[in-house]
Amino acid sequence: MTGKYMPRTVILGVIGSDAHVVGITILEQALSAAGFEVINLGVQTAQDEFVSAAKSHDAEAVLVSSLYGHARQDCEGLHDELDDAGLDVLTYVGGNLAVGQSDFEETQATFRQMGFDRVFDAETDPEEAIEMLREDLQLTTTEAEQIRVDG
């Protein structure tokens, strides 16, 4: 990278026993194209793997995907583990988060209460999530543009 801005590091993975890989592959490509350094943990990722990766890569955000409807069970306690490790990172969760999910606002509220900064459904455009990530990381327009140019 030739510019003065370093890419922001994000951890990405599919939590729990979920083996859906397509969504995180699309997210990884979109985030990389937007200039982020992406550490993709892949599928069937345990909470401690997210925590370990965030710590070892000095990540600024942990992005959790789940499409099989059991995200609540899989994510329970994740923020306690992040806190115990002394990490202060943004956390996003997205996908088909609950079996039979009919009221996404209720699902959002549940995950916000669990400590997630942003909650997305499976229909969210990756660019929307990236724009929110830039906003939450307080990237200036100049920095975001530089990341895109140099990335």
Curated annotation (Swiss-Prot):
Task: Give the catalytic activity.
Answer: (2S,3S)-3-methyl-L-aspartate = L-glutamate
Write down the required cofactor(s): adenosylcob(III)alamin
Q: Name one GO biological process term.
A: anaerobic glutamate catabolic process
In alphabetical order, the GO MF annotations are: cobalamin binding; metal ion binding; methylaspartate mutase activity
Domain named B12-binding is located at: 7-140
What top-level branch of life does the organism fall under?
Archaea
Any Pfam family matching the protein:
B12-binding
The free-text function statement in the UniProt record for this protein reads: Catalyzes the carbon skeleton rearrangement of L-glutamate to L-threo-3-methylaspartate ((2S,3S)-3-methylaspartate).
Record-given protein name: Glutamate mutase sigma subunit 1
User: What's the source species for this entry?
Assistant: Haloarcula marismortui (strain ATCC 43049 / DSM 3752 / JCM 8966 / VKM B-1809)
Q: Which gene encodes it?
A: glmS1
